[in-house]
């Protein structure tokens, strides 16, 4: 499994040529067989159930980077409402196929986890303001595709930030 975001900006063309060559060589290698989780499990039924699974991530081993802060929770509430509205409109069948496809793509943009990374008081205000405006703009775009009025809450700032400039970036300093 390759992490899809955190190192590629340091490669020319975001790692496109590197990854293309890497995957080509892996495919051609006589002793390596590429697969997906789904395909592997299809042919290997002997798996055992885990008795438990700990929630966590590579950031502090918790989900606190994405949820729990009041601003992050507000952003999730807005996304959940948008998803409910999306589901209702899609179930109605009233959108033309090409508009439905664009709405689905727009929803996928809104569902990206990076939005929630930026919300909260530990990131610098300038960065938070940019991501806040962009996130709300993407949600409004979704409502445009759905031909639904956007909730008035989308006109209000979700998060203001306020952290030190040194926190501006993909990694946060460890605690303790």
Task: Specify the residue positions occupied by each region the protein language model found.
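Active-site and substrate-binding clefts of carbohydrate-active enzymes
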Residues: 1-176
